[in-house]
């Protein structure tokens, strides 16, 4: 049970970091494009952040 709680806490922490990195990247894109960010860019950033978080977790357990 402790291992499960620890794993869930780790996933939550990594998810929070990934989302904050996506927000920073989106902010940088807005500055480059004069404030315009397409919906496609937002989705790509979120999905890449999630994928990076999953890869990190899997590398720790694998």
Swiss-Prot record:
Keyword Transmembrane helix: no
Name of the molecule in the record: Amolopin-p-MT1
Residues annotated as signal peptide: 1-22
Similarity annotation: Belongs to the frog skin active peptide (FSAP) family. Brevinin subfamily.
Matches recorded under Pfam families: FSAP_sig_propep
Function: Antimicrobial peptide. Active against a variety of Gram-negative and Gram-positive bacterial strains. Not active against fungi. Shows weak hemolytic activity against human erythrocytes.
Compartment(s) of residence: Secreted
Keywords: Amphibian defense peptide, Antibiotic, Antimicrobial, Cleavage on pair of basic residues, Cytolysis, Hemolysis, Secreted, Signal
GO cellular component, one term: extracellular region
GO biological process, one term: killing of cells of another organism
Tissue spec: Expressed by the skin glands.
Organism of this sequence: Amolops mantzorum (Sichuan torrent frog)
Domain of life per record: Eukaryota
Residue ranges annotated as propeptide in the record: 23-42
């Amino acid at each position: 049970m402790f291992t499960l709680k620890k794993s869930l806490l780790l996933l939550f922490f990594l998810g929070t970091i990934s989302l904050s990195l996506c927000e920073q990247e989106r902010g940088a894109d807005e500055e480059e494009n004069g404030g315009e960010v397409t919906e496609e860019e937002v989705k790509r950033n979120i999905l890449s952040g999630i994928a990076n978080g999953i890869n990190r977790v899997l590398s720790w357990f694998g």
